């Protein structure tokens, strides 16, 4: 397996860097006025990737904060992955043609599987499938709806269609700093035989070490958000902690 990659997260709403609790738009904390400044800070601490979420886009169903995404992709020596409201071929092409390394397709994977399969066929590893689950079932529409589809079943189906990278979020853990759902992340990796990036709940370097210890199952990285913003640890400390394992 390749190395374990850390993805510092920048969630964008109204052009600012924010965090929500469990995806609740009414529980918002603003951490900065400039996504580019935040990304620059992470790059200076050693980030190789930046994970961007367009929260306005997730709600609206089309891209909203794309100018900030392109500013980061074009001016920093990091790879960028973007999710949030990307539901059309035009939006996928827009990002990939403008220097974004990976586009995350989320709720459309349930509601419009033909679109997702077409994008996988066209762009391969530049597409990541975001699987957000609540109690093991896939959640859609910016976490506002829960489907009757099991996370592993969706993963297996899309792996057959060419998906190489999944991002798994346990919604109940997200923004709670209660530790990641390692078991569910590993289950998805084993079910699909593909790379799975863990997201949600990471509160310590020890949490990252637990996930990194599952590299052989296919758990290939972790997205870190609130822990960095609430200064539980710095990105530099996380990188150093993984180097020691």
From Swiss-Prot:
Reaction catalysis annotation: 1-(5-phospho-beta-D-ribosyl)-5-[(5-phospho-beta-D-ribosylamino)methylideneamino]imidazole-4-carboxamide = 5-[(5-phospho-1-deoxy-D-ribulos-1-ylimino)methylamino]-1-(5-phospho-beta-D-ribosyl)imidazole-4-carboxamide
GO MF terms, alphabetically ordered: 1-(5-phosphoribosyl)-5-[(5-phosphoribosylamino)methylideneamino]imidazole-4-carboxamide isomerase activity
Compartment(s) where it occurs, according to its Swiss-Prot or TrEMBL record: Cytoplasm
Protein's pathway: Amino-acid biosynthesis; L-histidine biosynthesis; L-histidine from 5-phospho-alpha-D-ribose 1-diphosphate: step 4/9
Entry annotated with the keyword Cytoplasm: yes
GO BP terms, alphabetized: L-histidine biosynthetic process; L-tryptophan biosynthetic process
Enzyme Commission number: 5.3.1.16
Broad class of enzyme this protein falls into: isomerase
Keyword Transferase on entry: no
Principal subcellular localization: cytoplasm
Pfam family, one: His_biosynth
One Gene Ontology CC term in the entry: cytoplasm
Keywords from the UniProt entry: Amino-acid biosynthesis, Cytoplasm, Histidine biosynthesis, Isomerase
Source domain of life: Bacteria
Catalytic center residues: 11 (proton acceptor), 132 (proton donor)
Family, similarity comment: Belongs to the HisA/HisF family.
Protein name: 1-(5-phosphoribosyl)-5-[(5-phosphoribosylamino)methylideneamino] imidazole-4-carboxamide isomerase
Annotated organism of origin: Bacillus pumilus (strain SAFR-032)
């Amino acid at each position: 397996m390749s190395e374990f990659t850390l993805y510092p997260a920048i969630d964008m709403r109204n052009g600012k860097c924010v965090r929500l609790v469990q995806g609740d738009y009414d529980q918002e904390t603003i951490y900065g006025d400039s996504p580019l400044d935040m990304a620059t800070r992470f790059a200076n601490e050693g980030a190789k990737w930046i994970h961007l979420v367009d929260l306005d886009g997730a709600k609206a169903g089309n891209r909203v904060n794309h100018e900030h995404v392109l500013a980061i992709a074009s001016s920093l020596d990091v790879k960028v992955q973007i999710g949030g409201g990307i539901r059309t071929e035009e939006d996928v092409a827009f990002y990939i043609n403008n220097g974004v390394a990976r586009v995350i397709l989320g709720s459309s994977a349930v509601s419009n599987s033909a679109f997702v399969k077409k994008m996988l066929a066209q762009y391969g590893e530049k597409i990541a499938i975001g699987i957000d689950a609540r109690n093991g079932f896939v959640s859609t529409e910016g976490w506002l709806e829960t489907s009757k589809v099991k996370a592993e079943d969706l993963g297996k189906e899309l792996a057959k269609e060419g998906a190489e990278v999944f991002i798994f979020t346990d919604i109940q853990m997200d923004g709670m700093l209660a530790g990641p759902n390692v078991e569910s992340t590993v289950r998805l990796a084993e079910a699909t035989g593909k790379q799975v990036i863990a997201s949600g709940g990471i509160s310590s370097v020890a949490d990252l070490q637990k996930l990194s210890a599952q590299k052989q199952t296919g758990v290939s990285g972790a997205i870190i958000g609130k822990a960095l913003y609430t200064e539980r640890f710095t990105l530099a400390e996380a990188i150093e902690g993984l180097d020691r394992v």
